[in-house]
């Protein structure tokens, strides 16, 4: 039991040190989930501790920043 908890903690700490690009890819994939799917995984969203509203706003900003205007 103790070993399993250590492994989980290790995984969590390594995730925090992932390069920014990979984090953005992960975020985008998470945001593409439908609202229904988000309700199916309440525990996962609690672990991330990121409010969905802030999440979507941040994503929209990133998307607008990447999209060339008037192209």
From Swiss-Prot:
Q: In which tissues is it expressed?
A: Expressed in brain and embryonic stem (ES) cells (at protein level). Expressed in the brain, ovary, testis, liver, heart, kidney and muscle.
A Pfam family this chain is assigned to: SNURF
* GO MF term (any one): ATPase binding
Q: Which UniProt keywords apply?
A: Nucleus
This protein's record includes keyword Nucleus:
yes
Q: Which GO terms describe its cellular component?
A: nuclear speck; nucleus
Whether Nucleus counts among this entry's keywords is: yes
List the InterPro entries hit by this protein, alphabetically: SNURF (IPR009847)
Which branch of life, at top level? Eukaryota
Protein location? Nucleus
Q: What else is known?
A: Encoded on a bicistronic transcript that code for two proteins, SNRPN and SNURF. Only the primary 1.6-kb bicistronic SNURF-SNRPN transcript is detected.
Q: PANTHER family this protein is in?
A: SNRPN UPSTREAM READING FRAME PROTEIN, SNURF (PTHR14508), SNRPN UPSTREAM READING FRAME PROTEIN-RELATED (PTHR14508:SF2)
The record's comment on protein family reads:
Belongs to the SNURF family.
Q: What protein am I looking at?
A: SNRPN upstream reading frame protein
The organism named in the record is: Mus musculus
